[in-house]
Amino acid sequence: MDFNAKTNPGRESRLQQLEEDKVWDVLIIGGGATGAGIAVDAAARGFSTVLFDTQDFSEGTSSRSTKLIHGGVRYMKNPRDWKLVREAMIERKLLLGNAPHIVHPEPFILPCYENFEREYYMAGLCLYGAMAYGGYEVGKTEFLSAAETIRRLPGVKADGLKGGVQFWDAQFDDSRLNIALMKTAEARGALLLNYVPVVGFERGCGGEITVVKVKDKFSGKEYSVKTRMVFNAAGVWADEIRRMVSPEVKPF
């Protein structure tokens, strides 16, 4: 990206807000899924909220997910994790309802080549489906014959195929959902700025962070932003932020 390019008027007006003598209730470092979620929640509760990202929004891990909103099928092996499975199913249903233009049901087929393999998978997936009681199921788990499996998966290895099992989860566009959350936060009054990395901190008398120093990559101008609360949502770069505050801390 050309950081010498002229920025748009909308960005300039946002940056001007940083020059106001204002103490923000919430300051968030990181514009990925976690930061966006915090921004929505804080702004919706009436807190003055500002968010900074050193790159573009959703440029890190939040754009490199599996693209799945699954109900936790991989956790079915351990009964101690079944509570987590149930929680994942509830969240999956909420996302399907709140963002149907981004999150949608998706079928998955497990081809089976061993005797009783279909029955083995079917038993586990039926239990998985049963845990979606109360309207949280996405689709019906079903046996598939070898012919039907080949019809639905034309590229599957046909030699020795006994059949298949189809179950349902959900798929989504991670970056689009992230940006949708950011737009929601902005509509609630949050100030969101990308390409504005954090470059330093100032502490108050009690050791708490009272000022966060940031720098606009386009203009090179630095700003000192007063805040009451800081959220480190920098993802894999969270340790870098922690060491800026306390160089002696152990890494996560």
Predicted regions and their residues:
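Flavin (primarily FAD) binding-site architecture
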Residues: N232-P247
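Glycine-rich FAD pyrophosphate-binding loop
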Residues: A43-S65
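Helix-loop-beta segment of a Rossmann-like dinucleotide-binding subdomain
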Residues: I150-R188, I209-K215, K221-V225
